[in-house]
Amino acid sequence: MKRTYQPKKRKRKRLHGFLIRMRTRSGRNVIRRRRAKGRKVLTA
């Protein structure tokens, strides 16, 4: 049985990247929360 996490850069960016986050209201909220928390890395 193979492991469940098979990392791919393209898929990671497409699903969790900054531009995708900025497209939806909830995504923008994610960015806002992470900025408020002081996260060094906002998105994948």
Swiss-Prot record:
PROSITE patterns to which the protein is assigned, alphabetical: RIBOSOMAL_L34
Domain of life: Bacteria
GO molecular function: structural constituent of ribosome
One Pfam family, short name: Ribosomal_L34
Biological processes annotated in GO: translation
GO cellular component labels: ribonucleoprotein complex; ribosome
Keywords (A to Z) from UniProt: Ribonucleoprotein, Ribosomal protein
Record-annotated membrane-spanning stretches: none
InterPro entries in the record: Ribosomal_bL34, Ribosomal_bL34_CS
DNA-binding found in the keyword field: no
Stored HAMAP family: Ribosomal_bL34
Entry similarity comment: Belongs to the bacterial ribosomal protein bL34 family.
Name under which the protein is recorded: Large ribosomal subunit protein bL34
Source organism (scientific name): Desulforudis audaxviator (strain MP104C)
